[in-house]
Amino acid sequence: MSAKGEYAIKAVLDLATHRARGLIPLQEIAARQGIPQRYLEQVLLALKRAGFLASKRGSAGGYHLTREPDEITVGAVLRAVEGTSAPLEPLGQGRRAHGDGHDLAGLWEEISEAVSQVVDRLTFGDLLVRAAERQSRVRPMYHI
């Protein structure tokens, strides 16, 4: 997965987490997620073109999801920004390994298919539930 794919996942998850607030400014998403604003603009534009986001300009502007988090899969978001048919496209796909001459294309195809199956069934609603469960397991430590 590229940085663009990772940033897209972070941005959509951030918007899903804060969706009750309505429009979320790009600067807030960038600051919370540690994403350069110029790069985030490109990612959000791709997600907007794909129909996952809507935006409003101006001082009270920002971005919001156009669908519920349960209706957006991680795979769909990755494809929107990566522009590929698979979320995992290995470098050198189809090349032969050095030394023994085994064709690794079949292995990469299986790995890519397995990753696709996971991200195509995993929604941002699922990620929100996981984050909430992880937060509930974190207990404060009091040191005296």
Residue ranges and their predicted role:
Residues L15, I29, V43-A50:
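Basic amphipathic alpha-helical segments that dock to polyanions
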Residues F52-T66:
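Beta-hairpin "wing" of winged helix-turn-helix
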Residues G94-I144:
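C-terminal regulatory/oligomerization modules of transcriptional regulators
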